[in-house]
Amino acid sequence: MLLSIFTSLLVPKLLGVESYGYWQLFIFYSSYVGLFHFGLCDGVYLREGGCPRDKLDKRKVNSIFWCGIVYQLVFVVIATTFLLSNKNSSDRVIVLLSTAVVLIISNAYSFFGYLFQAINETRIFSYSVIIDRVSYIIPVLGLIIARNANFAYYILSYIFARSIALLFCIVKGWDILTSGFISIRQTLRETFDCIRVGCKLLFATLASMLILGVARFAIDSRWGIETFGKVSFALSLVTFIMQFLMQVSMVLFPALRQANSSERKKAYISISGILDTISPFVYVMYFPVMFVISSWLPQYKESMLYFALLLPICVFDGKMDMCCTTFFKVLRQEKKLLCINVMTLIISSVLTFISAWVFGSLYCVLIGMVSAVFLRNLFSEYMLNKDFEVKFSLTHFVCVLMSGLFILFAYLFETIIAFSLYIGALVVYAYFQRTSLCKLSTGVKRIMVGDKD
């Protein structure tokens, strides 16, 4: 995460606003390449979750992997042929062709990543993520030192890093790749079964991404690549925190799959309560980040107002990923998750259309994004609360209130005044939540002492 922050502060410093916009457009498109494995990775993750490596049917998994590579290669060849015959701007063609290349590499990498997490070898996946980040930052630092402002080279660095991470996963999964194959008929049947199981989760994930994605597509179309770049910069700051929470949720899944119903209920209540309690403190980080960005990247000062409006996404989407989505997967309620995400996507699309093409307001688009994410979290918690027979806590509503106060203060007042007002509100909040905070602090201390022992 620190490496991501480091590069995200350096790259926009060197690239112009337009070039940075194309770089962010590539990152944006690349985030959707997972659609084209059609749920294969998700299916393997769900079917093999909790199964140790020594009990894994390696020949079956190997056959499924190569079957997935073949049908994705066919799609990439068709897409590349179409792109080369089309008359788009050269910069957009570079972005789209690079995305086609990343599709194969990233989906192969994702297959191993999901598999390692499913068989409870999360450490290997974590190492691959570190290798990916380090392999990216080394060439990027070289480009920055050379003051190379061509976004295409940064895309090449991304592809290189993802390839190195894939190579690491191949080495760690070599026993699987050399285990042999099952028959073609069995391979097709097993692949189809994985897609059938995983497609609901895939489309739920896709709908989840499009809740924010439709707004980003609209911003690119309505306001152009420079505004898209500025909004994407603000979203990239939000994404740093989200990436950390997603890694935590991946670790929770295998453990919760093996827990009984009462243990799952206790875990749900605990995780939900902890996230509600600590979430208001997340907003404090806005003020030092605002100061640093305004000084280091004055051309992105406008992005910080966008960041203030978008920061609640960390709270609501973070809770969704770490708590709600994890428990929907554990309870095998992918269909329910899909319905919630599709319903929220429709709301997001309507809000985006009205904001962008009726009101013509970028700020309304951003507020619509946050509103959609909040509603998704609310719907999900309502469903899970019914399943576990628990009620919404008062802390949940206070968390929503603190989010509203933060946006109000950041939008209406100068930074120093907004900071003072929010700290005052946070002190009042901490006073009324002192019992919960003390329990949380005691729990953290016990964990730290236990680690030392």
Predicted regions span which residues?
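Membrane-interface junctions at transmembrane-helix termini in multi-pass inner-membrane proteins
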Residues: I105-I131, P312-M343, Y382-F388
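Helix-loop junctions and terminal segments of transmembrane helices
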Residues: H37-R53, V238-L275, T325-V330
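Alpha-helical transmembrane segments of multi-pass membrane proteins
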Residues: S31, L73-V74, N88-F112, I164, ...
